[in-house]
């Protein structure tokens, strides 16, 4: 009565006799999440969708794919272009893993200023993971850390004389929080690599560095590269670091 209806919406006897119900499980194709949906179809053609986490299938909301940029592809293309930006005869290997994805523009520019080209490992594959699997010391590490072993093995197999993979307690300070720690695995996995892999004739350089202080950064880089027969001047290192930070900020 309050709704001013002349009759109830509850099914009457005749409708109940004719009532049928069909249930079907499908994977939603509305986006990459592919939610598991249960579609209930009734004899009058109406449907009830259950399991949905959004309204796309309920209200048939369609999003044109061309309106959604592929941000992953855009960033990957930018990183690939950055890799090819500098070229030198002298080369140093670096694994394209963990925080090195974000720091790729920094390190390519940094070593370019010092007269070296970075040879990056290729994108991760199942075969790459298997190639370094035997040297993984703990199954508790995350997969992105485990696959580092395959990236390092690839650089060794390429015959790189030197691999650079620094330990970094802190990431770049973006001044958006009280601190800027790296995940412990990101920060110190180079030590795990150095202790558990057979480098044959390849030498690995894994200093503890921080971007927060030019003097300590330059000293660490100079001292650790001297151990493998590469000599850098600390003033040149600081100049290269400043140029690299400008490159990093321009990229991001």
Explain the meaning of each model-derived region:
Residues 1-252:
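An N-terminal assembly and electron-transfer interface module characteristic of large anaerobic redox
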């Amino acid at each position: 009565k309050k709704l001013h209806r002349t009759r109830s919406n509850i099914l009457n006897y005749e409708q109940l006799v004719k009532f049928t119900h069909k249930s079907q499980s499908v994977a939603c194709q509305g986006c990459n999440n592919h939610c598991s949906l249960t579609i209930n179809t009734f004899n009058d053609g109406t449907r009830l969708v259950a399991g949905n986490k959004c309204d796309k299938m309920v209200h048939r909301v369609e999003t044109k794919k061309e309106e959604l940029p592929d941000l992953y592809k855009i960033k990957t293309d930018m990183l690939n272009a950055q890799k090819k930006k500098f070229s030198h005869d002298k080369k140093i290997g670096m694994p394209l893993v963990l925080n090195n994805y974000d720091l790729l523009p920094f390190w390519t520019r940094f070593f370019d200023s010092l007269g070296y080209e970075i040879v990056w490992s290729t994108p991760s594959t199942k075969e790459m993971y298997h190639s370094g699997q035997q040297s993984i010391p703990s199954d508790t590490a995350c997969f992105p850390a485990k696959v580092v072993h395959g990236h390092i093995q690839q650089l060794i197999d390429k015959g790189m004389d030197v691999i650079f993979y620094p330990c970094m307690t802190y990431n770049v300070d973006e001044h958006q929080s009280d601190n800027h720690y790296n995940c412990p695995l990101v920060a110190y996995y180079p030590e795990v690599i150095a202790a558990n892999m057979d480098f044959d004739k390849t030498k690995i350089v894994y200093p503890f560095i921080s971007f927060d202080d030019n003097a300590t950064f330059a000293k660490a880089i100079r001292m650790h590269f001297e151990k493998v027969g590469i000599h850098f001047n600390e003033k040149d290192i600081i100049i290269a670091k400043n140029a690299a930070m400008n490159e990093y900020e321009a990229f991001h």
